Regions:
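A conserved FAD-binding loop/helix module that cradles the flavin
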Residues: 226-236
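Catalytic P-loop NTPase motifs of RecA-like helicase/translocase cores
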Residues: 97-98, 223-225
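NAD(P)H dinucleotide-binding glycine-rich loop of Rossmann-like/cofactor-binding domains
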Residues: 8-58
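Conserved FAD-binding catalytic core of PHBH/FMO-like flavoproteins
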Residues: 60-201, 206
């Protein structure tokens, strides 16, 4: 499948601009956005290889992964099925069964929660800009992004106690405009939302990411706050390391890649966690922030806007560290 990846970049010039208005500091960070590959390509590969795909499976459970004969059980169409495996890749998300199957006495979980969420809407409106916009204002964080020429997604920082139904569309648009510079707010095209949700923010890592023949990938092993846009990127790096480990195992009879999977993946994950955590601290307003904290935050934003080396470091981390 990797040889058929279709890349459709929405490239920007990579500028970073800072605007100081009415005592509020708004920061723009502009980076390329890339669609990895369309789902039909993956489905076409499965069809060509005559591989069965089971959708809507329930109660998926890994078994005996500490032996050389692991297997999965799952329920589909009202019947229980068994799938014998060489290895199990646990790609079932934060709430899946894979991580929980690793014994508690060998599993260490690190977690940090944040005192706010992101209220996001999707609207069939042209984007306010073809570039991604991050804004840190005295009223809190805001993000403007495009899905296509007539579909936009916007986010604002909100209280964890808020509910989507608490926010009428007009209230959301008014608050978003307040968090953007006037010239940007004036260009904002508003309209009815077609989707509205609130996402809490957390940082999470599980160690190890391998136990026996069970390998954790993506959200099953780690969560990052969306500020750094590293969730899918980090999941892809996990799959990269696991894929190459399996290729070496099956083609060359080597086990080093699989044996070192957890160690290798975690080195990159913690760097990604650091970046996502730092971006979250940089761009949000925290309830406990002092005037000193706010001045340091503003100074960091100004430094990023003015210093090319800092911009390069941010861009390298935002696009994704090499793997």
């Amino acid at each position: 499948v990797g040889t058929r990846v279709v890349v459709d970049p929405l490239m920007g010039p990579g500028d970073m601009l800072g605007t100081n208005r009415s005592g509020a500091y708004a920061e723009y960070v502009v980076v390329p956005a890339t669609n990895v590959f369309p789902i039909p390509d993956t489905l076409g590969f499965e069809e060509a290889a005559a591989l069965p795909t089971v959708y809507q499976a329930e109660d998926v459970q890994p078994h005996d992964f500490d032996t050389d004969r692991p297997y999965l059980t799952y329920t589909a169409d009202g019947e229980t099925h068994r799938l014998d495996c060489d290895f199990i890749a646990g790609c079932d998300g934060f709430h899946g069964s894979s991580r929980q199957a690793i014994p508690e006495q060998v599993r260490t979980e690190y977690e940090k929660t944040y005192p706010f969420g992101w209220l996001g809407i999707l609207s069939e409106t042209p984007p306010v800009d073809h570039e991604l916009i991050y804004a840190n204002s005295e009223r809190g964080f805001a993000l403007c992004s495009m899905r296509n020429a007539n579909l936009s997604r916007y986010y604002i920082q909100c209280a964890l106690s808020d509910r989507p139904e608490d926010w009428e569309d007009d209230t959301f648009w008014t608050e978003l405009k307040r968090r953007l510079p006037e010239d940007t707010a004036e260009k904002l095209v508003t309209g009815p939302s077609i989707e509205k949700s609130i996402a809490p923010l957390r940082s999470f890592v599980c160690e190890p990411m391998r136990w026996g023949r069970l390998f954790l990938c993506g959200d099953a092993a780690h969560i990052v706050p969306p500020t750094g846009a590293k969730g899918l990127n980090t999941a892809a790096s996990d799959v990269h390391y696991l894929y190459h480990g399996m290729v070496a195992h099956y083609q060359d009879g080597e086990s080093e890649g699989l044996d070192r999977y957890s160690e290798t993946a975690l080195k990159r994950i913690w760097k990604t966690q650091r970046f996502s955590w730092s971006m979250t601290n940089l761009l949000h307003r925290f309830p406990e922030q002092s005037e000193f904290d706010l001045h340091v935050q503003a100074a960091e934003l100004a430094f990023l806007a003015e210093n090319e080396a800092a911009q390069r470091a941010l861009a390298e981390n935002y696009v994704g560290l090499a793997y």
